């Protein structure tokens, strides 16, 4: 009975994870992107770190879009966001299911590209990503808790990843996000100067979290963000 129950639990977990992976495709397929000004090399594993809401997930979406543009089928791209409440009970032992399901979906023996968002939510994740990197999978991860933000993360990952700190928008990125795409280094007209000054005033007043651009009540958003930022760094 114990073995039967264990097998049923395994199947249920596998089916749930597969559904989550399918559901989450919509997240990166339907999100508009502002190309960030970070240089990313091909065939390098990245660990994107930074406080919440700086756009770490969007760095992954940007990479996925580039892979798609390079002709990589979406079936060979695996994205999992571990903030999903359906993954609360997931353990490090379950992580290999991601590979199994990815290979099943791709219907090929070619190693899929892995994007694991906020993976620090899974205890023991470090050994999994090191093993997968050693197996020559292309894998990118994000994290925002105190351990991921500390200098320890490089040694934790054993030199297998390039650690990249992600920050809120630069002012030039902020202008692009606000549909101001002229070369404002050569601003001449009075109206252009006024437009840039207006955006700069908002930039220094409210900051440049990517999500903030579309928010009307920026102050309320920032107050909520401060709560979210402090929570993971205490863990």
PLM region descriptions:
Residues 48:
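Hydrophobic anchor at the beta1->P-loop junction of P-loop NTPases
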Residues 59:
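Hydrophobic positions on the alpha1 helix immediately C-terminal to the Walker A/P-loop
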Residues 80-109:
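Short glycine-rich substrate-engagement loop in P-loop NTPases that contacts/grips substrate
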Residues 25-41:
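Pre-Walker A adenine-sensing motif
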Residues 147-162, 178:
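Short regulatory helix/loop adjacent to the ATP-binding pocket of P-loop NTPases
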Residues 138-144, 165:
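Structural recognition of the conserved hydrophobic beta-strand(s) that form the central parallel beta-sheet
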């Amino acid at each position: 009975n114990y073995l039967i129950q264990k097998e049923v639990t395994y199947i249920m977990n596998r089916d749930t994870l597969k559904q989550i992976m399918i559901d989450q495709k919509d997240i990166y397929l339907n999100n508009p992107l502002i190309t960030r000004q970070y240089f990313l090399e091909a065939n390098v594993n990245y660990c994107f770190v930074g406080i919440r809401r700086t756009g770490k997930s969007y760095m992954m979406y940007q990479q996925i879009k580039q892979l798609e543009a390079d002709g990589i089928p979406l079936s060979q791209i695996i994205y999992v966001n571990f903030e999903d409440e359906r993954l609360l009970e997931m353990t490090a032992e379950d992580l290999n299911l991601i590979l199994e399901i990815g290979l099943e979906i791709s219907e090929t023996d070619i190693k899929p590209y892995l994007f694991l968002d906020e993976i620090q939510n899974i205890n023991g994740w470090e050994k999994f990503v090191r093993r997968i990197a050693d197996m020559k999978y292309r894998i990118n991860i994000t994290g925002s808790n105190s351990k991921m933000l500390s200098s320890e993360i490089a040694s934790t990952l054993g030199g297998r990843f390039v650690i990249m700190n992600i920050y809120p928008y630069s002012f030039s990125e902020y202008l692009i996000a606000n549909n101001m795409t002229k070369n404002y280094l050569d601003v001449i007209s009075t109206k252009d100067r006024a437009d840039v000054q207006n955006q700069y005033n908002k930039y220094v007043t409210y900051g440049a979290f990517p999500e903030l651009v579309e928010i009307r009540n920026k102050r309320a958003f920032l107050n909520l963000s401060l709560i979210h930022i402090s929570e993971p760094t205490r863990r």
